[in-house]
């Protein structure tokens, strides 16, 4: 028999439980006349009566009556609603698919449509169109910035608040649970209206009875034949984006005024033509954008990378094109917001996310909070600029960006401790700071009662940003070459040397060190000079190379222009490596956080180790600090600090004369210049030692090639100390036959191909190292072993006189700290690794160095037998200070692509300090070199 309940299915083609259409159900309910009027007026009756598949969120007539009495639109009755307002009310409340409430937070997994991902979705597009809310903006409403200048003097314009449709934002139980969002979080997000994570909230409005634990009063998931009805407690007005939310609250008007700086009227011809075609309107149509590093570019997300601003091309930069004047403006990278707060369908940087999965977040202080900050912690800005409007946009950008958080779900109030500032340290926001929350279509705005500032404002890098007119070149380098995060650390104490734009016009090109001319027996240095300037129109640093001359007092005279150094390919690499080398020489990390450079100098210290390992010499002349890099020391030239800026993590020093520059001399050149080093140089450079070279890997060339310099191949991209024994000390070892004599180190005429080596042959004969009856092949093998052993002896001798880490007399020492980080003592005595490796342990044999303001000693290795008995006690040697051969700074450069005089790119550099010592350093027990050779030959 057939059930009578199947009659509906037979007669209508639908089961009885499916119910009527959405439109009919609203009619039957009897208390949704306003929603029905909206449907009728917008021509949606047929869609919601018969066809389509929709989810409609509806508010009862009583909710509308309450809304007419209090709304932001100023509408007091239905008849006052404009057509765009009606579209916003209906279409923002409707989704073009049928969804059960509990399934709205699910998302179909990629690659397997049958396996939805639970609790992944918090936003969905609605039936709204971007054209539903075209706004007519009057000239006096336009933001007061340069991008609107051509329009403020004209007529009103039609503008979209965004070109992408505004999605619905919903907080549903599955999403809240999946992202560990607590009931207290939801309570704060809804301004204390929510009480349970079982509730469902859509655009800040609660779904009726959605939190009923017994589910006895269910007013959602009303099933209709063409979709679902979800009843909500209040009227869903629209889905404003975060930027609109800030502008809508008068108590955030100061912050909104700051956002005006970034507003850009973007004209899209295709969009305009489409609008005119559909709406029969010939007026130009603009889109309101906010200049940002992440924005919607017409076909998808666009991300601006800082490195794009290092190139000559405009590609990859944020370019505004005024359609009326056809003038292009490159908006500076440091004037771009973190993301566009007006992008309705904002997508974060998580590549696995779409607009559905997350949203953004803005922290916006009240007007009172801004005023209190301006008169308190921000007083230094007030003193500098007078009014907030006068504060340069790059500074304002840093302030706004630290309060723009790219993902919402990761940083809800219960996770505020994870909100980090630009130094990757806690921003400091707590739930108690929240005055009100706003849910937008692209994120949540937290209105707070205090201003959260970036770490940059307290860091040593800040003066360069704050004084852009005089230091924008060095700040661009700090920001562009990743030094800014390093300088933001509040756990370190810095001294940062900041060259002015004038100083940046006199940069010595290290690839040209060693160039000179001689006239009338007078030698004049002729290095190349790099002149850096900042092109405001292109928002990039430009560089020109010049010839120059340097007089005996270190004064540089700029000469003939050689050409520009561009921003592409190998030239960009050249510049970036030069920037890095320069910046590493301008940053000093002070070991004792309670000290300043001035205090150290007052205590007698003169040398400070830089971030890159080189040394800066600092003296006090008439109460002003004077800086000298290695080059300035060589040329007896001081660079005065003309301004000091005290910040939370150290002090910055403005220099205008020139940039402190590392030494131009290699170790080889330094040894050549002083006859007192001649014996050690012989030990370095002879027929048995190959530690010096002018090329590396057949690809890199040593610096100062014009004077045939060579580099110490033992060194890497680090800092070192070389101890040079006196000539007499080396001669004494030669006399003891511990080291070969100069004559023995000369192999004379030898041929590696034929293995003909008469000098070594004569030694082997004299010492009886050839066994009786040895043929020529055997003799050649013995000679090869002798050469190999002597090469090792000489290399090891040099290696034990070279240590990791530069150390100088008068250098600020490292410190010992307790468990709380408090300084307990200065580490004047330290053990450093030499370059000589212990073949048994594999470790580098140490040297013990003790250095003070006026002396230094070096103690060589103590050797013990297997039982722990000392068989060779360490010997302490003094650095000789009587002849001035100490604290000699050197720098060894390796250049890539040095085919001509102007295209060499710095590959790496080593910083070295050379000291003469009064004895020879021995890693082990003294052994005559002949005994070592005999052992290698197996001769007893």
Language-model features: where?
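Mature, structured domains of secreted/extracytosolic soluble proteins
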Residues: 3-940
């Amino acid at each position: 028999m057939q059930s009578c309940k199947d009659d509906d299915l037979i007669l209508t083609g639908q089961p009885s439980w499916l119910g009527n259409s959405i439109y009919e159900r609203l009619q039957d309910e009897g208390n949704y006349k306003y929603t029905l009027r909206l449907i009728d007026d917008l021509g949606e009756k047929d869609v919601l009566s018969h066809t389509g598949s929709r989810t409609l969120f509806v508010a009862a007539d009583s909710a509308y009556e309450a809304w007419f009495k209090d709304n932001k639109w100023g509408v007091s009755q239905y008849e006052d609603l404009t057509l765009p307002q009606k579209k916003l009310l209906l279409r923002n409340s409707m989704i073009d698919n049928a969804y059960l409430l509990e399934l709205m937070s699910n998302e179909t997994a990629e690659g397997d449509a049958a396996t939805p991902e639970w609790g992944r979705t918090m936003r969905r597009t609605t039936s709204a169109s971007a054209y539903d809310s075209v706004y007519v903006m009057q000239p006096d409403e336009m933001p007061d910035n340069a991008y609107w200048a051509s329009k403020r003097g004209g007529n009103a314009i039609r503008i979209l608040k965004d070109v992408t449709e505004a999605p619905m934002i919903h907080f549903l139980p599955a999403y809240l649970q999946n992202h560990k969002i607590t009931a207290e979080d939801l309570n704060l997000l809804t301004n204390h209206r929510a009480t349970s994570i079982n509730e469902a909230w859509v655009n800040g409005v609660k779904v009726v009875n959605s939190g009923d634990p017994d589910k006895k009063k269910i007013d959602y998931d009303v099933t209709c034949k063409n979709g679902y009805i979800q009843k909500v407690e209040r009227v869903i007005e629209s889905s404003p984006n975060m930027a609109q939310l800030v502008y809508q609250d008068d108590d955030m008007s100061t912050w909104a005024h700051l956002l005006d700086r970034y507003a850009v009227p973007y004209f899209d011809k295709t969009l305009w033509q489409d609008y005119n075609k559909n709406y029969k309107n010939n007026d130009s149509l603009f889109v309101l954008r906010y200049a940002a590093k992440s924005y919607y570019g017409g076909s998808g997300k666009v991300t601006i990378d800082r490195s794009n601003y290092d190139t000559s091309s405009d590609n990859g930069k944020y370019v505004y094109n005024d359609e009326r004047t056809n003038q292009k403006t490159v908006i500076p990278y440091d004037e771009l917001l973190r993301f566009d707060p007006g992008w309705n369908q904002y997508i974060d940087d998580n590549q696995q996310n779409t607009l559905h999965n997350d949203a953004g977040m803005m922290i916006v202080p009240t007007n009172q909070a801004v005023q209190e900050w301006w008169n308190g912690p921000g007083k230094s800005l007030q003193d500098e600029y007078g009014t907030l409007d006068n504060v340069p946009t790059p500074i304002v950008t840093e302030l706004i960006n630290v309060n723009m958080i790219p993902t919402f779900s990761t940083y809800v109030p219960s996770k505020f401790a994870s909100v980090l500032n630009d130094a990757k340290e806690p921003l400091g926001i707590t739930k108690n700071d929240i005055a009100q929350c706003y849910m937008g279509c692209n994120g949540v705005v937290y209105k707070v009662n205090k201003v959260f500032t970036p770490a940059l404002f307290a860091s040593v890098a800040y003066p360069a940003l704050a004084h852009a007119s005089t230091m924008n070149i060095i700040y661009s380098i700090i920001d562009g070459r990743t030094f800014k995060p390093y300088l933001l650390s509040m756990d370190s104490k810095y001294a940062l040397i900041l060259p002015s734009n004038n100083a940046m016009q006199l940069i010595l090109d290290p690839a040209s060190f060693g160039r000179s001319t001689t006239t009338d027996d007078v030698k004049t240095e002729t290095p190349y000079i790099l002149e850096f300037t900042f092109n405001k129109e292109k928002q990039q640093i430009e560089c020109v190379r010049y010839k120059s001359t340097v007089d005996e007092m270190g004064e540089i005279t700029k000469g003939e222009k050689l050409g520009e150094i561009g921003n592409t390919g190998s030239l960009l690499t050249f510049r970036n490596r030069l920037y890095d080398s320069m910046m590493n020489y301008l940053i000093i990390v002070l070991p004792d956080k309670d000290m300043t450079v001035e205090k150290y100098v007052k205590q007698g210290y003169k040398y400070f180790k830089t971030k890159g390992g080189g040394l800066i010499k600092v003296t006090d002349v008439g109460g002003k600090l004077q800086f000298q890099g290695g080059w300035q020391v060589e040329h007896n030239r001081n660079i005065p600090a003309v301004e000091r800026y005290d910040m939370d993590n150290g002090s910055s020093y403005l220099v205008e004369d020139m940039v402190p520059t590392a030494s131009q001399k290699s170790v080889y050149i330094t040894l050549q210049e002083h006859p007192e080093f001649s014996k050690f140089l012989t030990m370095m450079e002879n027929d048995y030692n190959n530690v010096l070279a002018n090329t590396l890997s057949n690809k890199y060339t040593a610096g100062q090639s014009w004077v045939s310099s060579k580099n110490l191949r033992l060194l890497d991209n680090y800092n070192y100390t070389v101890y040079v024994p006196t000539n007499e000390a080396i001669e004494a070892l030669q006399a003891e036959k511990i080291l070969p004599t100069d004559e023995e180190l000369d192999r004379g005429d030898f041929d590696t191909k034929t293995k003909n080596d008469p000098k070594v042959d004569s030694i082997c004969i004299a010492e009886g190292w050839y066994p009786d009856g040895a043929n020529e092949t055997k003799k050649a093998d013995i000679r090869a072993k002798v050469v190999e052993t002597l090469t090792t002896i000489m290399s090891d001798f040099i290696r034990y006189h070279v240590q990791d880490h530069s150390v100088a007399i008068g250098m600020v020492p490292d410190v010992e700290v307790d468990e709380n980080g408090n300084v307990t003592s200065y580490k004047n005595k330290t053990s450093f690794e030499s370059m000589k490796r212990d073949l048994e342990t594999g470790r580098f044999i140490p040297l013990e160095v003790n250095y003070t303001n006026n002396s230094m000693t070096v103690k060589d290795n103590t050797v013990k037998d297997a039982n722990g008995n000392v068989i060779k006690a360490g010997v302490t040697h003094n650095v000789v200070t009587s002849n001035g051969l100490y604290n000699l700074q050197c720098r060894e450069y390796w250049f890539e692509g040095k085919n001509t005089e102007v295209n060499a790119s710095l590959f790496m550099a080593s910083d070295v300090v050379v000291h003469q010592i009064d004895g020879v350093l021995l890693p082990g027990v003294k052994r005559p070199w002949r005994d070592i050779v005999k052992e290698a030959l197996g001769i007893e």
